[in-house]
Amino acid sequence: LIITLICLPTFLETLKEKDIPLNSIEGFIRQIIGWREFMRGIYWLKMPEYEQQNFLNANQKLPSFFWTSETNMNCIKTCVKNTQDNAYAHHIQRLMVLGNFALLAGLRPTEVNDWFMVVYADAYQWVELPNVTGMALFADGGILSSKPYAASGSYINKMSDYCKNCYYNVNKKNTVEGCPFNYLYWDFLIRNKEKLHKNQRLSLAYKTLERMDLAKHNLIKKDAKVFFQRLNNGQKV
């Protein structure tokens, strides 16, 4: 672990001959003195119990496509391939694509953490575990993060070009042709309503869910059920 007081002066010294935007410099420094130290603090404060946190009782096995990249979801496929090639992925790919799917699908936190530890060259447990357990999976129930970072396909479409070349249609909310992130997002909120509906940062999402009629709720749950059946039967999803 490189301590902050050594890291930052060295970084600032390298900037003297480089033309780097101020917002990029600020963002990097804030990550070093803020988020990194916060993760380290959570780890030392909450271990070893933190390693077994599973607030949402997520129990779905880690899909094989996390290792093989054999999936029809282009965002997942691309991020896994990048990880295979480089032992690295951007933090948004980790959180809002791979972590987001793990959250929505209810993957077991221990298996997700094991995967992150194995595949990334920069994965040290003190920083990987809080980010995955607390930030990506909300498995600690809000110790680290104030809400689950759950998002539908529309978010991924806005933030990337993955959806343009995907097998699924991101504009379709249901059926086997629709993006799984769309119905899995609402199914996630339905499944975990008892634990999450009082979270103020999810109030708009739950108000939208309440406006949906029973038929819509049933369709969401049906699509999610079919998806999980195919996944658990070894079919390509």
Predicted regions and their residues:
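C-terminal catalytic domain of photolyase/cryptochrome flavoproteins
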Residues: 3-237
